[in-house]
């Protein structure tokens, strides 16, 4: 279960048509749009072309989800394990921060703010924390405004696991304290540089903790997956990775593998969900 941070989604009214029109204007006059330093070359990581292992064939033989009252079994929506070839691409080294998102809002003049910001300002001393409580649409718009996109599931997973398909950035076994996740984590967002050991084989940071991340893709079965899952379809978008949690089954070690897959309505927003961007150039 995701950590919700709002009482009613309907309190936050969206007007994406006007927003996209605004962004279209900004794209047409790029000379007048200052670029955040988040988009300097050294802030994105080149993931080289090549094969990687995606998904898993693992099965939870103990039915852990039933013991804790969860609906979805572990791992099954990530079957089957397979090798995939991807061309090279770039991905943000860090999650998009409050300060970076604030700059985007100033440039776009979009007035729909993250729910926990007060008077248009992010919480004090949290400029370098990942921005949260943004919908998929807002995350997508941010990336688009900078000539990028949200990473696909494939891009996200390759960046997280490397060519060897590791379950954790540092290796095969979960090690407490290496990422902001679980009962020993901070149970709140932390600066994107706070956990230097949460570094993927490509040195992409924070993919296994701090916040879960929106991806570009709909929640669909992988090729070859025959599971009958009623939530599959073009209704929910995919969240990847783990984030801080305050309670619940996410404290269990079985739920901590770094490439975990979750689904959410693209109109919803959460206190432990953020995003990063990717690019082919």
Whereabouts are the PLM-identified features?
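A short glycine-rich, aromatic-capped structural motif
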Residues: 39-114, 134-135, 209
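N-terminal secretory signal peptides that target proteins for export/translocation
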Residues: 1-12
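Functional-site microenvironments in short loops/helix caps that host divalent-cation chemistry
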Residues: 47, 53, 57-68, 111-262, ...
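Ala/Thr-enriched low-complexity intrinsically disordered regions
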Residues: 3, 17-18
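Solvent-exposed residues in well-ordered beta-strands and their adjoining turns
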Residues: 24, 87, 278-280
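Bacterial N-terminal signal peptides
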Residues: 18-28
């Amino acid at each position: 279960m995701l950590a919700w941070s709002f009482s009613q989604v309907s309190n936050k009214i969206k007007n994406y048509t006007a927003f996209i029109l605004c962004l279209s204007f900004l794209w047409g006059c790029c000379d007048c749009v200052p670029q955040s330093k988040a988009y300097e070359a050294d802030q994105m990581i080149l993931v080289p072309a090549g094969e990687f292992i995606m998904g898993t064939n693992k099965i939870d033989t103990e039915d852990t989800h039933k013991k804790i009252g969860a609906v979805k079994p572990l791992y099954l929506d990530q079957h089957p394990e397979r090798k995939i070839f991807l061309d090279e691409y770039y991905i943000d080294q860090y999650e998009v921060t409050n300060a970076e998102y604030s700059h985007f809002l100033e440039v776009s003049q979009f007035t729909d703010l993250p729910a926990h910001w007060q008077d248009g300002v992010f919480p004090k001393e949290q400029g370098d924390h990942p921005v949260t409580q943004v919908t998929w649409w807002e995350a997508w718009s941010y990336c688009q405004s900078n000539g990028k996109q949200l990473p696909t599931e494939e891009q996200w997973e390759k960046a997280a696991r490397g060519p060897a398909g590791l379950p954790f950035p540092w290796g095969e076994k979960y090690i407490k304290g290496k990422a902001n996740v679980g009962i020993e984590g901070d149970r709140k967002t932390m600066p994107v540089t706070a956990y230097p050991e949460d570094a993927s084989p490509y040195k992409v940071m924070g993919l296994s903790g701090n916040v879960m991340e929106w991806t570009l893709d709909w929640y669909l079965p992988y090729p070859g997956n025959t599971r009958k899952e009623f939530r599959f379809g073009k209704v929910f978008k995919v969240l990847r990775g783990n984030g801080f949690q305050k309670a619940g089954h996410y404290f269990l070690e079985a739920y901590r593998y770094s490439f975990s897959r979750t689904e959410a309505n693209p109109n919803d927003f959460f206190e432990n969900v953020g995003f990063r961007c990717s690019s082919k150039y």
